[in-house]
C-alpha cells in the first residue's frame, strides 16, 4: 500500500541505521486526556491486523490520502507543527496491505475528544452509554463510505506497527516552517 509519512530527520537516521523505525514513547504527543484514545486504537490494531512486535507499544502513522486525493503530500502545507528550522523527511513508502489499518482523520478527532461517532445524522444519540460510544468509534474505520454526516473531502490516515527500511521508495528532506 502506497503511503506517505513525515518523520523528524533524527527518526529517519534511526531507520537508516537500524533498518526499522518504531514509535518511541518519549516522543509521542498525547499525554493526559488523549492516551485512552490511542490505547483504544492499539487494541483495535491488535484485533484487525495482528499483534505488534514485542518491543512495540504504539504505531507509526502515515497518510493514505489527503483531502480526497491519493498523491504525495504538498509540503507547502504539511511542514508546520513544530519548531521552525527542524529538519524533517517526507517518506514515500510501500507497506504490505495486511499490516496497515486505515482510519478517517476527521472522525479520529471525535475519538480524541471522547465523543460519540455516528456515521449518519439519524444515528446520533444524545446521551450514549460508554458501550455505545466505544462501539461507535469503530466507524472511524469506514473509510470508503460517503454519508450525510461526514461529507468533507476525506483525509485517510494509516497506522502500522513498524516501518522497515526496505519499504522506503523515496526520501525528501524539508525544514519545518514553524
Identify what each model region corresponds to.
Residues 18-50:
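Membrane-interacting alpha-helical segments
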Residues 38-71:
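Short, well-structured hydrophobic secondary-structure segments
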Residues 1-2, 9-31, 56-58, 67-178:
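Conserved NAD+-utilizing ADP-ribose enzyme module
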Amino acid at each position: 500500500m502506497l503511503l506517505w509519512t513525515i518523520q523528524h530527520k533524527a527518526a529517519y537516521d534511526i531507520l537508516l541505521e537500524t533498518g526499522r523505525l518504531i514509535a518511541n514513547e518519549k516522543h509521542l504527543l498525547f499525554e493526559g486526556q488523549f492516551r485512552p484514545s490511542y490505547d483504544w486504537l492499539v487494541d483495535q490494531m491488535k484485533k484487525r491486523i495482528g499483534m505488534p512486535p514485542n518491543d512495540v507499544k504504539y504505531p507509526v502513522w502515515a497518510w493514505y490520502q489527503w483531502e480526497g486525493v491519493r498523491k504525495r503530500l504538498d509540503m507547502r502545507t504539511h511542514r508546520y507543527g513544530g519548531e521552525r528550522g527542524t529538519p524533517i523527511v517526507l517518506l514515500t513508502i510501500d507497506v504490505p496491505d495486511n499490516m496497515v489499518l486505515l482510519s478517517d482523520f476527521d472522525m479520529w478527532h471525535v475519538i480524541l475528544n471522547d465523543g460519540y461517532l455516528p456515521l449518519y445524522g439519524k444515528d446520533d444519540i444524545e446521551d450514549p452509554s460508554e458501550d455505545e460510544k466505544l462501539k461507535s468509534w469503530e466507524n472511524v474505520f469506514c473509510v470508503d463510505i460517503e454519508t450525510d454526516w461526514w461529507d468533507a473531502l476525506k483525509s485517510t490516515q494509516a497506522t502500522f506497527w513498524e516501518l522497515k527500511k526496505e519499504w522506503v521508495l523515496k526520501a525528501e528532506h524539508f525544514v519545518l516552517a514553524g
